[in-house]
Amino acid sequence: MWDLIIDQTQLLKLKEFGIFNTKTNLNGVIRDHIYSRRNGFDQGVFPEILRHPANCQILHCKENASKRSSSWISIEDLFFKIKNYSGLWVEQELVLDKISQYEQGKRWTNEYRTNN
């Protein structure tokens, strides 16, 4: 996924700080979901949408810790970003179909989740 980064500012951050590692690089960066996975799963957003490169950003580990599970973008803005994504993404057509399904009211459900 690191090779899918097209934003120059984020590429510079990656080059300057490197990838976070608990043993070798505590000052590194990590990949973060702009629209959080937690919000996505709570709202029934399809995983294919959440993993799209347009939903990823590079953050310092400390920034990510302070962000926790909050989203920095609305679902509508994420859909706009994905629909206008100019990079190459192997799942682009699939994700556009999932967005259309979501906009028509269909939601992802975790068939493995048990309600005890």
Give the predicted meaning of each segment.
Residues 51-83:
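Short Cys/His-centered divalent metal-binding micro-motifs
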Residues 19-27, 74-116:
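Extended charged
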Residues 20-56, 69:
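Histidine-centered nuclease catalytic patch
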Residues 11-13, 36, 63, 67:
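Intrinsic structural disorder/low-complexity segments
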Residues 14-15, 45, 73-75:
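N-terminal functional modules and adjacent low-complexity/disordered segments of proteins
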Residues 1-30:
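Contiguous alpha-helical segments
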Residues 1, 34, 60:
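Extended interaction regions within the primary functional domain
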